[in-house]
Structure formats: C-alpha cells, structure tokens
C-alpha cells in the first residue's frame, strides 16, 4: 500500500502498456528509489499470474514492453532532481536489474521473438556502455561474459534451460573461474 501524496510528490505512476505488461517493474523501482522508509511483509498478498494464453511472453508487442519499463526507470531517474552521484547509483542498479529481467523474459518469450529481443538488448547495453552509464564490471562474472557474448554475436548459443545447461554455457564462455562464481551464487 502506498500513500497517494508520496506517489504524487515523486511523480510515480504505472506506465501504460498493452494488457498491463510488466507494469510492476518501473513502479516498484521508483517507489523503492524514492522511499525514505518501507515496511515489508513476509506473507504473500499478490497472486502473480504468468504464461496464460494471452501472456506478455507470447505476444510480440507485449514481449518488448519490459524494455519500455526499463526506459521509464532511466527517464524517471534522469528527471528526478537527485544529485549526480545518486542518479549514477540508481542508473547502474536499474541496468543491473534490467539484465536479469531481460534474461528472465528471453527464456519465456516465444522462440520467434528471441533473436529480435536479444538484438534490442544488445543495442541498449552497447549504448549504455558507450555513454558511460554502465560497465560490464557492474555485473557478476557469469552475467558479464554472457552479455559480452550477446553483444558480440546475437546468434551464438545461449545457455540451455536448467542449472546444468547454464553451468556448461558459463564454463564455455568464461572458464573455470566464471563457472565457480556462478555455482557459488546458487548455494
């Protein structure tokens, strides 16, 4: 639950998207970035539905809506009036979260949407890196080698689903040290 005056004071609104696709992403980011304090509950109060017949991951228009959510996060940070240091921290945090969201989306979208989705992902990260708002070093080692490979060759194989498929992929891309970092993160 949110106080309306808090949302209004910080210009926090849901981004309008087809079928409310991914709307929670930028809303939650903005709320957490603007909040001075928060209370979290351990019991679930939302029933999160995914992968139904008209799911975001099955529609070309909706599959790319996640990209609009991350663009909205960056727009909001830029317009926030925060000092440059705070903007930099929040921008990097959004771009780290974006990697995870994009990869989550990638494995769920229809196969025919995967190549165009990775192309957009690669273009967005190339721009962020060239503008200096993001560095591959901001990512964990296995994510870093994976994103580097996506930007290098969109058609290179991505990790097979499941822990073993990803482990083999990270070993191939980054060697034993990257595999070890990935496995340590999964404990």
Predicted ranges, named:
Residues 24, 29-30, 53-57, 70, ...:
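Charge-rich, low-complexity amphipathic helices
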Residues 43-51, 57-84, 98-131:
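Catalytic core of nucleotide-sugar-dependent glycosyltransferases
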Residues 1-61:
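Conserved nucleotide-sugar donor-binding catalytic segment
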Residues 107-187:
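Membrane-interface aromatic/basic loop that binds lipid-linked glycans or pyrophosphate carriers
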Residues 84-93:
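All-alpha amphipathic helical-bundle segments outside canonical DNA-binding/catalytic cores
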Residues 25, 49, 91-92, 139:
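Residue-level signal for alpha-helical context at structural boundaries
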Residues 12, 35, 40, 55-56, ...:
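Gram-positive cell-envelope targeting signals
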Residues 1-2, 30-31, 94-102:
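Solvent-exposed aromatic/hydrophobic patches embedded in short alpha-helical segments
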């Amino acid at each position: 639950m949110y106080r309306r005056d808090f949302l209004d004071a910080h210009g926090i609104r849901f981004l309008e998207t087809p079928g409310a696709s991914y709307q929670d992403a930028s809303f939650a980011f903005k709320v957490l970035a603007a909040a001075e304090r928060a209370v979290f509950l351990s019991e679930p109060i939302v029933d999160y539905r995914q992968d139904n017949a008209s799911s975001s991951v099955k529609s070309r228009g909706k599959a790319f809506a996640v990209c609009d959510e991350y663009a909205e996060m960056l727009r909001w940070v830029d317009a926030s009036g925060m000092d440059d240091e705070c903007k930099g921290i929040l921008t990097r945090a959004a771009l780290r979260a974006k990697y995870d969201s994009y990869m989550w989306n990638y494995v769920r979208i229809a196969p025919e949407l995967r190549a165009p989705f990775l192309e957009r992902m690669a273009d967005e990260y190339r721009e962020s890196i060239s503008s200096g708002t993001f560095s591959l070093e901001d990512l964990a080692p296995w994510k870093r080698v994976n994103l580097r490979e996506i930007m290098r060759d969109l058609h290179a194989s991505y990790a097979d689903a499941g822990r073993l498929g990803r482990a083999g992929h990270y070993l191939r891309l980054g060697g034993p040290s990257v595999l070890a970092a990935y496995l340590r993160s999964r404990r």
